[in-house]
């Protein structure tokens, strides 16, 4: 299974491979550098997130300023919490807001009138259910990713290779969120 960070890197790779622009939000400068090195067009370091309405408004304005059209066609949100509403406010007309998870902890409450004002859609993306309910489509996606990997259109970030006998160390690294990219176990 992929960690949230690994899914984000894979999505960013697929977005870039399809010719779209990737604006990425991260919590630290270290992650920002990695995203820039791996081709993100813009990177926003959001730190601990907006703490009040003014900070949320400023965060949304910063997000909008990085878009070309004054709003995004697609927002992929694995974070939720206090980041969700400012991100949704940065969506463009007829944009799609993909709800992927709630890594920041709290399930956000969005003012539903924003969907009306922006003609936007909120879409739940739950890969676990998708694999069973839409098996054939999932297989097509996996084949597409494998093809992109084989021709070098996407390149996973391998942050560390660890001998198989140290698998426990690898699991601990991933569990502590101390890894950006993939940890590969080798014989």
Q: How would you describe each model-predicted region?
A:
Residues 1-7, 11:
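Single conserved hydrophobic/aromatic residue that forms the stacking wall/gate
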Residues 18, 26-29, 35, 82-154, ...:
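Glycine-rich phosphate-binding loop and adjacent beta-alpha segment
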Residues 146-147, 151-160, 168-187:
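C-terminal capping/lid region of NAD(P)-dependent oxidoreductase domains
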